[in-house]
């Protein structure tokens, strides 16, 4: 499997990072300065460059941000433990949330309170379903399934283009059938597969 996209975090503030990118003539595909996010492209690899930050004031899709220099705080804003792994320039893994252990054991675990994480951003429910497609036998806690079923109406609030993007990503993964089976088990076909 070849890498098609890379996420990079940087301990700089958005205007500083923008200045650096422009000074070094690094092409920027898109940017969201309010969130400290820059989309770059190198050859065939998409690169998301994000300033370290903490999120607050969530409304189910968006949040307000405070830029930070704290990698640990940045990790806590992420959805799943497997998405909170960092690799420094020396090649050392930095893991504040037990993500490496969870990858090695096919565990899909939210960071902190799973209900709170999903209510902060409803798309996290769909992302969770998508991440089931990267593991042969993903471990999915029973309480997550119950919560997803009880809160399936939240999926109606997600823009269709965001749902479609996540669904497309499911089908490029080896174990896409895990996600499809979970969608059916959760009875979410009407919310997701008819889009």
Question: What is each stretch, according to the model?
Answer:
Residues 1-195:
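Catalytic cores of the polymerase beta-like nucleotidyltransferase superfamily
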